[in-house]
Amino acid sequence: MAVSKQVIATEAITRKVDLDNPKVVAKLKKNMGHMTYGEPAWPNDLLFMFPVVILGTIGVIVGLSVMDPAGVGEPADPFATPLEILPEWYLYPAFHILRIAPNKLLGIALMSAIPVGLLFVPFIENVNKFQNPLRRPVATTVFLIGTLVTLYLGIGATLPLDKWVTLGLF
């Protein structure tokens, strides 16, 4: 007898606690977490894990700032124009698209393609209903390609035009 995927999925979702098992009943009476496994989130997470994570984060930030402090740049000169004016780091990919486009119309078209592409993200995400990224190959591939292109354009924006294709490596 073949069991359909729908029956297996429904059975996995509607799984009930085995109240005939005395070990399970004992754990539930001691309030040992949800269903039959784990430990309660209160007070363990709030009283132990949160302070450890907060103190660890503060320690990492202080350690990095002591080991490698941010250097102070040259003083500003209001009468000298910088050699190359760059936008903030989060605008590097868009700036680089405009910089490498051969004409203004193509640059505007490429810039408008970014939000149009983002409009299609929900439709790409709904191709597959799984939550695991390894079982959603279309969405994972689109995300990885988009991330790599954005990083490539962002790094290339900081380089001169003759070196951006190879990112200055060759």
Curated annotation (Swiss-Prot):
Its membrane topology is listed as:
Multi-pass membrane protein
Per the record, its GO cellular-component terms are: plasma membrane-derived thylakoid membrane
Localization, UniProt:
Cellular thylakoid membrane
For this UniProt record, the keywords arranged alphabetically read as follows: Electron transport, Membrane, Photosynthesis, Thylakoid, Transmembrane, Transmembrane helix, Transport
Listed GO biological process terms: photosynthetic electron transport chain
PROSITE patterns associated with the record: CYTB_CTER
Q: Which residues cross the membrane?
A: 46-66, 105-125, 141-161
User: What molecular function does GO assign, one term?
Assistant: oxidoreductase activity
Q: Which family does it belong to?
A: Belongs to the cytochrome b family. PetD subfamily.
NCBIfam families for the chain: cytb6_f_IV
Give the PANTHER family listed for this entry: CYTOCHROME B
Give the record's subunit note.
The 4 large subunits of the cytochrome b6-f complex are cytochrome b6, subunit IV (17 kDa polypeptide, PetD), cytochrome f and the Rieske protein, while the 4 small subunits are PetG, PetL, PetM and PetN. The complex functions as a dimer.
Q: What does this protein do?
A: Component of the cytochrome b6-f complex, which mediates electron transfer between photosystem II (PSII) and photosystem I (PSI), cyclic electron flow around PSI, and state transitions.
Annotated protein name in UniProt? Cytochrome b6-f complex subunit 4
